[in-house]
Every structure is written in structure tokens, then in C-alpha cells.
Amino acid sequence: MGEEANHNNNNNNINSNDEKNEEKSNYTVVNSRELYPTNIFHALLALSIWIGSIHFNLFLLFISYLFLSFPTFLLIVGFFVVLMFIPIDEHSKLGRRLCRYVCRHACSHFPVTLHVEDMNAFHSDRAYVFGYEPHSVFPLGVSVLSDHFAVLPLPKMKVLASNAVFRTPVLRHIWTWCGLTSATKKNFTALLASGYSCIVIPGGVQETFYMKHGSEIAFLKARRGFVRVAMEMGKPLVPVFCFGQSNVYKWWKPDGELFMKIARAIKFSPIVFWGVLGSHLPLQRPMHVVVGKPIEVKQNPQPTVEEVSEVQGQFVAALKDLFERHKARVGYADLTLEIL
């Protein structure tokens, strides 16, 4: 009997070791700069195209107002208004090629390193809901998950973003080609039904109200919409955390209850931020995007509030666990995460 028990224990240990070895073998790390080498010129050009559109618009309007006749200035304003509403061909070959260039060179500026706990857990014939945190000033690390970066085995990916993005001239074209789309429930549901995996940033712009220096904030407790949609569609939830993203800009925001009331009223946090030489270009600080294992979600067309809260709790717990297990590995051993 004793020999049999020892034999069983040895088998259990062997199986346990095999599972651990398999997990390690499925763990994937990809550094953007090693995969897509760049230089200062290409990196800064890509970043300027990606996030400099708003500044370009304002600069052009300002220069036009100062140096051109008033009728010409009005023509330029009218042109921008047209760009706000003109339909976009999201499958444009030129646009897609531009954004492939932008994504790959911009990521290599920092660089961004993608960590996937189990690459074999993702299948090209399935759609997933990625919950990405934190938002920070800009969620720049999310670009490493796009199909332009071409690491995850998911050929159809979309990032859900605020509707305000799609009313901004030039920016709406570039970000649409880069895979961003409007964050409405109707759009979200239709994309999942069509086989698209969707990346959601649950904390959204409101998360920036609570940003703190030296720690990370995830505004999740009141965010159940993405969980409900995942349940209604029966799509796995995937926790994702980006380490270092909060360091690519220096920022300042006023404190106090009055500021919070104003920010909530305008649905925007008017923070002051700056990067390279005080510009809008982000600092060259490394980021690590860690993708956890999918949480299987049973399809439930009409989940109750309690059922949604239960699955939301599973997601939050998985995100916290992901954060704690990887923070030392990527150089942030003392960093803390607060869930609000």
C-alpha cells in the first residue's frame, strides 16, 4: 500500500511538473523593437501621425486665422467640418498600410513588450473580449494587441473608443484605419457576432479623474456593461494590464471636489500633460502589456444584475492576480493597484 501511495504521489508530482512546463512553454514574450526595428525619425513620424492630429488641426486653424483672408479661413473650417462627417473606408489599402507603419514604429519607440501567458488559449475562429487597464493619459500600449502588430493569432481585432474620437477631423480617419471603432453597445454586439475580438478599456476617460502618481488605478466597480455584453454573446473575457504606460507622459491635474464635479459634468478630465521636450510626443519609457488567460463565459441572453456582478468579480480578481504575479517580473515590484 505504501509503495502504491508513493507511486501515486510521484505520478501526481510528474503531472504537476508537466503542467507547469507546458504553461512555461506556452508563455510568449515579444519585444516590439526586436520584432520591428526602428530609428528616431520613423518612430517620431509614426507617433506624430498617430497622436498629433489634434495638434495639427489646431495649429492649421490658428495659422490660417492669422495669415489668410477671412473667407479662406472659413473655407478651411468648412473643410474640417466635412472631414468630421464624411464616410471612411475602413478597409482602405492605403490607410491600412499607413497604420501598419504607425503601429509598428510607434510601439518600437518605447518599446512595448507583449507578454501572453498562454498563446495556445487563443483560437483564430473565436472572438474574445479583452478588458485592458489602465487608461492613463492615453492607452498607448493597446496598439500592441492590434492586428497590425500581428502577434496574437486573431485576424479580426477592434478597439472600442469614445465617440468623440470619431468627430475629430483627420484623427478619426487614422484611428479608424488603426482598428478603432465607436464604443456603443450595438456596435460592440455586432462586431462580436461577426467574429471580431474587441478590446475594451473599461475605466475609460473617467478613470483619469482618479489617477495618482506612483500607483495604478482601475475604475472597474461601476463598469459592468462590457461584462454583460460578453455574457449575452457567450464570449470569453481576457484580463490585460499594461505596466509602464502611466510613465510615458508627465502630467498634472487639479484636486478637489469642484474639479471632480466639473470633470463629471463635461465627461472629460482636463489634465495637463507633456512628453518629449514639453511636446505631445510621449517619453521613451518601456511598456509591458501582459495578457492573461481567457475566462470562459457561458452564454446568457438575459443575465441578471447578480449574475453580471458575479462574472465581473471573476474578471476583477483575475486582473488583480495578473497584476500581482507579473509586476516584479517587469520591474515594478513595489507598484500597487487600487480597484475603484
Swiss-Prot record:
<keyword id="KW-0256">Endoplasmic reticulum</keyword>
<protein>
    <recommendedName>
        <fullName>Diacylglycerol O-acyltransferase 2</fullName>
        <ecNumber>2.3.1.20</ecNumber>
    </recommendedName>
</protein>
<keyword id="KW-0808">Transferase</keyword>
<dbReference type="Pfam" id="PF03982">
    <property type="entry name" value="DAGAT"/>
</dbReference>
<keyword id="KW-1133">Transmembrane helix</keyword>
<dbReference type="GO" id="GO:0005811">
    <property type="term" value="C:lipid droplet"/>
</dbReference>
<comment type="function">
    <text>Involved in triacylglycerol (TAG) synthesis. Catalyzes the acylation of the sn-3 hydroxy group of sn-1,2-diricinolein using ricinoleoyl-CoA.</text>
</comment>
<keyword id="KW-0812">Transmembrane</keyword>
<keyword id="KW-0443">Lipid metabolism</keyword>
<keyword id="KW-0012">Acyltransferase</keyword>
<keyword id="KW-0472">Membrane</keyword>
<dbReference type="GO" id="GO:0004144">
    <property type="term" value="F:diacylglycerol O-acyltransferase activity"/>
</dbReference>
<dbReference type="GO" id="GO:0005789">
    <property type="term" value="C:endoplasmic reticulum membrane"/>
</dbReference>
<comment type="similarity">
    <text>Belongs to the diacylglycerol acyltransferase family.</text>
</comment>
<feature type="transmembrane region" description="Helical">
    <location>
        <begin position="18"/>
        <end position="38"/>
    </location>
</feature>
<feature type="compositionally biased region" description="Low complexity">
    <location>
        <begin position="7"/>
        <end position="16"/>
    </location>
</feature>
<comment type="pathway">
    <text>Glycerolipid metabolism; triacylglycerol biosynthesis.</text>
</comment>
<dbReference type="InterPro" id="IPR007130">
    <property type="entry name" value="DAGAT"/>
</dbReference>
<dbReference type="GO" id="GO:0019432">
    <property type="term" value="P:triglyceride biosynthetic process"/>
</dbReference>
<feature type="region of interest" description="Disordered">
    <location>
        <begin position="1"/>
        <end position="23"/>
    </location>
</feature>
<feature type="transmembrane region" description="Helical">
    <location>
        <begin position="41"/>
        <end position="61"/>
    </location>
</feature>
<keyword id="KW-0551">Lipid droplet</keyword>
<keyword id="KW-0444">Lipid biosynthesis</keyword>
